[in-house]
Every structure is written in C-alpha cells, then in structure tokens.
C-alpha cells in the first residue's frame, strides 16, 4: 500500500511539472521563431490569406488553427489571441523545418496551409519533390513551391497568387 501511495505521489509530481515544461518549451520555440527577421511578414501573410475564421469554418479557429482533441477554443477569441495562436503554430512548424536553413520559414508557411505530412512524407504521402530538391542542396525551387496551388487537380488562381507572394516576400537568395 505504501508503494502505491509513493507511486501516486511521484506521478502527481511529474504530471504537475509537465505544464511548466510545456510552457517553457513553447516560450523557447516562440523566441526562436520570432527571432527570424521575416517572422512578422510570415504572420501577416497567413493572416491576410487565411482571414479570421468563424463557426462556419469548424474545426478551424483563429487564422486557420485546426482544433486538437483536448483543446478548448472559442470563436469569440480576439484578434490578438488568434495571432498568438498562429505564432505558436508557426513556431512549432518552424522547429520541424529549421534544418533547411534559409528556406525554413518558407516551408513553415507552406506547411501551415498544405500540412507538414504532405511536405515531409507521412501517412501514405511520399516526401515532396520540393523537400527532396532542398535536401539535394538545390535551391531553385520556385516552380515546385508555386505548384502547391491546386485543388482537385485544377489550378486555383487565388492560391497561386498567395504562393507567389509568399515566395516573393520570404525567399532568401
């Protein structure tokens, strides 16, 4: 009985420290993302093209955040709260693409719209040609980047304009 009580106490102690570690990690990720010189441009681009979502956009909240199973979100969030949520999402994605150097922010913004699994290969998707090209140290990626503008096989002009604007403002030669 004493052993169970000690295990329970240990588990409670560990669980109690998780949120602090999580917020510490989130703060570190946000600082890393926000230190990028073009982070604010990336945030403004996503805000412009995503727009603030409402109830008709369920399960998307804020500026395109997809609600996770244990999250409690409201459509009544302020623009500042929605932007903070967007920055947190972009920071988490930025961590995944950091190894791509100058192209990390560009891949971060693209993955926010198309999904990181499509780019990095996950769930039946092979690794994208864009990422394979970058891994081969070939940075001539304009065509591959702007190719992510199709829906059901057809080019969508508004998405094409978005990709061109993202590339123009975020690509670092």
Predicted regions and their residues:
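Universal eukaryotic N-terminal targeting presequences
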Residues: 1-3, 17
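Surface-exposed patches in mature extracellular/periplasmic domains of secreted proteins
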Residues: 54-58, 96-106, 144
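Generic short alpha-helical segment signal, independent of protein family or function
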Residues: 91-94, 98, 112
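Early exported N-terminus immediately downstream of N-terminal targeting peptides
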Residues: 58-61, 65
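Intrinsically disordered/low-complexity terminal segments and short unstructured peptides
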Residues: 12, 22-25, 107
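Sec-dependent N-terminal signal peptides
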Residues: 5-14
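Short N-proximal segments of mature Sec-exported proteins
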Residues: 104-118
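Long, amphipathic alpha-helical surface segments
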Residues: 18-53, 65-72, 76-94, 118-173
């Amino acid at each position: 009985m004493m052993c169970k009580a000690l295990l329970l106490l240990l588990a409670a102690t560990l669980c109690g420290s998780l949120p602090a570690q999580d917020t510490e990690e989130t703060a570190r990720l946000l600082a890393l993302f926000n230190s990028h010189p073009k982070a604010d441009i990336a945030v403004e681009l996503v805000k412009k093209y995503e727009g603030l979502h409402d109830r008709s956009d369920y399960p998307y909240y804020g500026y395109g955040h997809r609600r996770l199973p244990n999250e409690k979100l409201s459509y009544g969030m302020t623009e500042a709260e929605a932007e903070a949520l967007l920055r947190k999402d972009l920071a988490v994605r930025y961590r995944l693409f950091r190894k791509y150097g100058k192209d990390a922010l560009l891949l971060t913004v693209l993955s926010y719209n198309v999904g990181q699994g499509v780019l990095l290969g996950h769930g039946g998707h092979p690794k994208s040609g864009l990422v394979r090209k970058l891994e081969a140290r070939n940075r001539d990626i304009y065509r591959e980047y702007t190719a992510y503008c199709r829906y059901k096989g057809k080019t969508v002009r508004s998405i094409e304009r978005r990709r061109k604007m993202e590339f123009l403002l975020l690509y670092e030669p």
